[in-house]
C-alpha cells in the first residue's frame, strides 16, 4: 500500500529552506513536549536511540539550492532589483543547538525562547512530517526545499522593497527569509519518532535574523554584490562568508 505523506509548514516565522543539521534524534514511544521547548526540560518520553552526523550532505544541499535561488532572483530575473550586499550563509553551532533542543520538545511554539544575546530577532522554520513510513532524510528535506522555492512566483518587487509575509499570489515568508540579506547563518535540528503507528518528524531551522515588516528584504544596487568587501569565489554575485554584516541591525 502506498504511504500517505503529509508535509505541514507550521510556523508563522517559517522558511522551507533546509540547511545541514548537527544530528538526528530518533525517539522511542510517544513524544510530548512543553510549550516553550527550548527553555523547558525536554520530555522524558524522548529517548535518543542514535545520532547521525549529516552536516556535510545537508550543508551541500542547502548551499547549492539556496544560492541558486539567490542568483536566480537577484541576477537572472528581471522582475526583481539586484542585491548589493548579500553573503553566502554559514552554519552556526548555537543556532543548531537551540533548534535541536526545540525539536526534542515536539512543540513548534517557541518564538520567545530562541532569542539570545547574539540573536535579538532570529527567524525560524518549523517543518512537521507524518506518514505511514518515514522516508529517507534527504528526501524529506528536499521536499521542504522545493516547497519554499516555489514561492518565487509569489514574491514581487514591492515585497522586496517593503516586506510583507503574503503577496498577491500567496505566502512569501519562507523564500523571503532565504533571500533576506541579514540572514548570514543558520542552524537546524531534527527529531523523529513513532506515534499511533505513524512515522513523525519535527524539523527546525533557526536563522540569524528575520524579515522586518515594511522594511527592505535586501539592500538594492546597480549591480549584484557591488557593496561587498569581497566576493565569494564560487558564487560571484554574493559576498564572501566573512562579510561583516550585523544580523541585529535593520535595513533602511
Swiss-Prot record:
InterPro entries: CAP_dom, CAP_sf. One of its GO terms (cellular component) is extracellular region. A motif (Cell attachment site) lies at residues 32-34. Expressed in salivary glands. Residues 1-23 form the signal peptide. Pfam families: CAP. Its main location: secreted. Gene3D superfamilies: CAP. GO terms for molecular function: toxin activity. Keywords: Cell adhesion impairing toxin, Hemostasis impairing toxin, Platelet aggregation inhibiting toxin, Secreted, Signal, Toxin. Residues 63-207 form the SCP domain. It is found in: Secreted. Inhibits platelet aggregation induced by all agonists tested (ADP, arachidonic acid, the thromboxane A2 analog U46619, thrombin, and snake venom snaclecs (TMVA that activates platelet through GPIB, and stejnulxin that specifically acts through GPVI (GP6))). May act by competing with fibrinogen for binding to glycoprotein IIb/IIIa (ITGA2B/ITGB3). Belongs to the CRISP family. This is Tabinhibitin 9.
